[in-house]
Amino acid sequence: QDVKEDLHSLLDSVEIIWSEAGLPLPDNFGWQIVSNVPMGQGLKSSSAISCAAIKALNIATWTGLNESEIIDLSVSSQRHAGCTVTGSMDDSWASISPGWKLVDPSQPAKYSILIEGEIKEDYCVFIILRGTRSNEINSQKFNDQLTIFERSLSSLSNGSVFHAMSANGMAVAAATDDDEALRICNNVIANGALSAAITGSGPAISVVCFKQDKALIEEVLSRTQYEIIESSFQESDLAEMIK
């Protein structure tokens, strides 16, 4: 079954990895992707799709996989599909569970979480959509920004999640020669945003602010002429929200 939104044939890879793990597939089933998350902009749509598909198979076949097992299958599926270099374990955790996590992708998901914490829901989140990724990702350029990435890690270790996000985004912008992203992020932070950063490897940008600053930040973002999505942090488990 072809799913037009599945550009990397990720769902085929999910089925292959699921079967290779010795898990049963339903006799008759099909896929449909229902999502407002744009693809190819650093918003982790591949991790979300793979986790959702594996959770759906888990429910349909009464397999009883836990979160860590679902994450491991998601990582393997994304690698098999070729839509990630690292396996995107961090992104898979973000897709399936609330809060934030610092993970070691070299470890199985069960042992991968190094630090984790919660983010309160009383913030506004904006996503600036700047089209699909056009720049090639050069791993050496990312290595050149090691000092800034280390600053991000230090902030996270000290509990400064938003500072960590901004520093990480600054490093990614420098590594991808994205001067526009740096200008946008610096501008919204100067106008009161708590954080502004490229998401993933870009080019989308996330902005976090207090709810009382929402109108001002919206006005600043409107000047960019890009499409803006408003979102929020969710500390509730997805299953609880569905109920």
Regions picked out by a protein language model, each given a short descriptive name:
Residues 1-41, 220, 232-243:
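ATP-binding N-lobe of GHMP and related small-molecule kinases
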Residues 15-19, 52-60, 154, 170:
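Short glycine/serine- and small hydrophobic-enriched flexible loop segments
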Residues 25-37, 72-81, 181-192:
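Short, hydrophobic/aliphatic alpha-helical segments
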Residues 26-29, 89-90, 97-98, 121-124, ...:
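Short coil/turn connectors at secondary-structure junctions
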Residues 43-67:
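DPxDG-like acidic metal-binding loop motif
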Residues 68-113:
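Alpha/beta catalytic cores of group-transfer enzymes, especially the acyltransferase/condensing modules
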Residues 111-243:
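C-terminal nucleotide
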